[in-house]
Curated annotation (Swiss-Prot):
<dbReference type="InterPro" id="IPR003789">
    <property type="entry name" value="Asn/Gln_tRNA_amidoTrase-B-like"/>
</dbReference>
<dbReference type="InterPro" id="IPR017958">
    <property type="entry name" value="Gln-tRNA_amidoTrfase_suB_CS"/>
</dbReference>
<dbReference type="GO" id="GO:0050567">
    <property type="term" value="F:glutaminyl-tRNA synthase (glutamine-hydrolyzing) activity"/>
</dbReference>
<comment type="similarity">
    <text>Belongs to the GatB/GatE family. GatB subfamily.</text>
</comment>
<dbReference type="InterPro" id="IPR018027">
    <property type="entry name" value="Asn/Gln_amidotransferase"/>
</dbReference>
<dbReference type="InterPro" id="IPR004413">
    <property type="entry name" value="GatB"/>
</dbReference>
<comment type="subunit">
    <text>Heterotrimer of A, B and C subunits.</text>
</comment>
<comment type="function">
    <text>Allows the formation of correctly charged Asn-tRNA(Asn) or Gln-tRNA(Gln) through the transamidation of misacylated Asp-tRNA(Asn) or Glu-tRNA(Gln) in organisms which lack either or both of asparaginyl-tRNA or glutaminyl-tRNA synthetases. The reaction takes place in the presence of glutamine and ATP through an activated phospho-Asp-tRNA(Asn) or phospho-Glu-tRNA(Gln).</text>
</comment>
<dbReference type="GO" id="GO:0070681">
    <property type="term" value="P:glutaminyl-tRNAGln biosynthesis via transamidation"/>
</dbReference>
<dbReference type="InterPro" id="IPR042114">
    <property type="entry name" value="GatB_C_1"/>
</dbReference>
<dbReference type="Pfam" id="PF02637">
    <property type="entry name" value="GatB_Yqey"/>
</dbReference>
<keyword id="KW-0436">Ligase</keyword>
<dbReference type="InterPro" id="IPR006075">
    <property type="entry name" value="Asn/Gln-tRNA_Trfase_suB/E_cat"/>
</dbReference>
<dbReference type="InterPro" id="IPR014746">
    <property type="entry name" value="Gln_synth/guanido_kin_cat_dom"/>
</dbReference>
<keyword id="KW-0547">Nucleotide-binding</keyword>
<keyword id="KW-0067">ATP-binding</keyword>
<dbReference type="GO" id="GO:0050566">
    <property type="term" value="F:asparaginyl-tRNA synthase (glutamine-hydrolyzing) activity"/>
</dbReference>
């Protein structure tokens, strides 16, 4: 069962020169829709193609070319909305957002201001120690991406690459529910995790497939609660938007430095201007780009080339029926079915590949032992070599085989680590490694008993001390394991030593 009991974390408080201030943050996340074709043309969305290779006549805004909606992009937006527990609008429409920029051939962007395809939803952002922030999603709308202007290829000229022009984006707009830099990064991380589970966006921030505009404002303690009670934004400070953030670390740094900038202005008796700003990570500062535009500045109007988008509830229901298991549900199942701790379940469900690998290892085996081997041994080794789980040289069947050898007392946990190392570097089968390398555990009580008796007889002083202090029995265990090359069954060794010392 999905357990959603949690406590709301305290907001981030920054001490100014005169008083304390709280942060209020909202985010607009631009997520590139996973689709082979663009939103209104059949041009490819392949990343890294030669400049201006993936451009159709529609993308280039050639005269007489009309947009045609990509149904799959609509389906992906609906799927995303359902994954965020959002309301799906059966009626939506596209509008023109008018502005001029060299990499926007049409002279406008096709977006959805008045009638977005997805309404209100939510994202539960866990912050550890039983705390979580429920961040409300105001809306999700579909829109076109712009192209890319390139200014560093020539000192006297700029260039334009239209490959990205017309690529489908989902703009996921949150309410101002985020209360600190860490929460902002955690929200973006959780949103990315959900989209990856859904298969609607790959979440690759480096390539620009996911980027965020971060709205930051400050308020005095108690003012946010007044806003919550009245939904009156006048209780909050003037917000500034930090544009095009594509790094979790930079998002946190930008929020912190922007909040401190606003605090300094207000405490000096000034007023914060509503504007769009850019974060400079080298100087760790935000810089003004332009005054913040409102909707009327873009002269939005319904796009006359596109009919309103009408979808049927039965189609939405069919998409909902085929949604994959999402992170929170998978995490709860791992805790319940495999007896895992909250931490282990979180690590293993961080991405689909890790979760799938663990389930394959744990099938028919002890879940806690499987989690221990996957997290501590496999993930630890992969991290050291900067490899992803998909590049693991040890298959789930091989790691499961090592666990089976431990469970059957064929090898000890210590020897199992040696087997894992050989398996990792050579790809050999664990059972074959144990057999050919002579690593099988000694379970013959007679042979172990002889080794125990020999160690006991050779160390009378240690025997006397161990009888007075039972904790010293571990020394004998170590000596027996050493004498048997680590192959003796530790459980049998402990039992025999305890028996001999009690005599």
């Amino acid at each position: 069962m999905l357990d959603l009991t949690y406590e709301t974390p305290a907001p981030k408080v920054i001490s100014g020169a005169k008083e304390d201030w709280e942060l209020v943050i909202g985010m607009e996340v631009h997520a590139q829709v996973t689709s082979a074709a663009k939103l209104f043309s059949a041009a490819s969305t392949q990343f890294g193609a030669e400049p201006n290779n993936n451009v159709s006549f529609v993308d280039a805004a050639m005269p007489g070319m009309l947009p045609t909606i990509n149904e799959y992009c609509v389906e992906q937006a609906v799927r995303t909305g359902l994954g965020l527990k959002a309301e799906i609008n059966l009626h939506s429409a596209f509008d023109r957002k008018n502005y001029f920029y060299p990499d926007l051939p049409q002279g406008y962007q096709i977006s959805q201001l008045y009638h977005p395809i997805v309404g209100e939803g939510e994202v539960l952002v866990e912050m550890g120690n039983g705390t979580a922030r429920l961040v409300r999603v105001e809306r999700i709308h579909l829109e076109q991406d712009a192209g890319k202007s390139i200014h560093d290829m020539d000192p006297n000229m700029s260039f334009v690459d239209l490959n990205r022009t017309g690529v489908a984006l989902m703009e996921i707009v949150s309410r101002p529910d985020i209360r600190g830099p860490e929460e902002a990064a955690a929200y973006l991380g959780k949103l990315r995790q959900i989209l990856r589970y859904l298969g609607t966006c790959n979440g690759d921030m480096q390539s620009g497939a996911m980027r965020a505009d971060v709205n930051v404002s400050i308020c005095r303690p108690g003012q946010y609660e007044k806003y919550q009670a009245t939904q009156d934004f006048s209780h909050l400070g003037t917000r500034c938007e930090i544009k095009n953030m594509n790094s979790m670390r930079f998002i946190q740094q930008a929020i912190e430095v922007e909040a401190r900038r606003q605090i300094a202005i207000v405490e000096a008796g000034g007023t914060v201007d509503q504007e769009t700003r850019l974060y400079d990570p080298d100087r760790n500062e935000t810089r003004s780009m332009r005054s913040k535009e409102e909707a009327h500045d873009y002269r939005y109007f319904p796009d006359p080339d596109l009919l309103p988008l009408e979808i049927e509830q039965a189609w939405v229901d069919d998409i909902a029926a085929n949604l994959p298991e999402l992170p929170d549900a998978k995490k709860a199942r791992f805790r319940n079915d495999f007896g895992l701790s909250d931490y282990d379940a979180s690590v293993l469900t961080a991405d689909l590949d890790s979760a799938g690998y663990f389930e394959a290892v744990a099938a028919g085996r002890d879940g806690k032992m499987a989690a221990n081997w996957v997290i501590n041994e496999l993930f630890g080794r992969l991290k050291k070599e900067d490899h992803a789980i998909t590049d693991s040289p040890v298959s789930p069947a091989q790691l499961g085989g090592i666990i089976d050898l431990i469970a059957s007392d064929a090898i000890s946990g210590k020897i199992a680590k040696d087997v894992f190392e050989i398996c990792y570097t050579t790809g050999r089968d664990p059972a074959e490694i144990v057999e050919t390398e002579g690593m099988k555990q000694v379970t013959d009580t007679g042979a172990i008993e002889a080794a125990v008796d020999e160690i006991i007889a050779a160390n009378p002083d240690q025997v006397a001390k161990a009888r007075e202090n039972p904790k010293l029995a571990g020394w004998f265990v170590g000596q027996v394991m050493k004498a048997t090359g680590g192959k003796a069954n530790p459980k049998v060794v402990n039992q025999l030593i305890a028996k001999r010392l009690a005599e």
